[in-house]
Regions:
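Radical SAM enzyme [4Fe-4S]-AdoMet core and its adjacent flexible, acidic
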Residues: 1-107, 112, 117, 121, ...
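Flexible mid-to-C-terminal extensions adjoining Fe-S/redox cofactors in radical SAM and related proteins
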Residues: 115-178
Length: 178
């Protein structure tokens, strides 16, 4: 399907979630396949984190394991050739080299029920409007260190926005990474 879409002139990006049983060699093989064989425009990656509604709780990554896995992945010889769809500082955060707080409102999710609170993974209710989501959600209650359900989270929906803000504020810092 990806090759067909590319043949038809579509830009293709793939999203993948990495879980506990994956090792850096397998991840590198997948990224090489996406970049070299499929020639996708980019890969969006995120660590699998044990949010409570997930049906399989035993294959998720802890923060410690996430950092080690991404350090090992980015140490691979081909790492600089892979096309990721995320900021370099977010990728550096995944490897444990940046300390960020979650920005749960940075990637709001909406479905037929409304705007999800506080993020699509926790889904602790819905707001009827974006204004209601922003003004009636107590954002300080969420994020790693503030809420036990967020303890191991390093997911893009909360941390990419923080990394992008850091990139805008410190562009030279972002250029130093990778």
């Amino acid at each position: 399907a990806i090759r067909k879409a590319k043949d038809l002139g579509f830009r293709v990006n793939v999203a993948c979630t990495l879980f506990d049983q994956l090792d850096a060699d397998e991840a590198a093989e997948f990224f090489n396949f996406c970049t070299n064989d499929l020639q996708v425009e980019g890969v969006t990656i995120s660590p699998g984190y044990a949010y409570e509604r997930a049906p399989d709780q035993k294959h998720f990554l802890s923060r410690r394991k996430t950092k080690q896995l991404f350090r090992d992945i980015f140490a691979k010889p081909d790492a600089k050739t892979w096309r990721f769809s995320q900021s370099t500082l977010f990728l550096d955060f995944l490897a444990g080299n940046q300390s960020y707080k979650c920005t749960p409102w940075g990637n709001p999710a909406r479905n037929v029920f409304g705007w999800q609170r506080p993020c699509y993974l926790l889904g602790e209710g819905y707001a009827d409007s974006f204004k209601s989501l922003m003004e009636e959600t107590n954002w300080d209650d969420y994020g790693t260190g503030n809420y036990e359900k967020c303890a191991d989270c390093m997911v893009h929906c909360g941390y990419e926005a923080t990394a992008v803000s850091d990139t805008v504020a410190h562009p030279l810092k972002a250029l130093d990474v990778f």
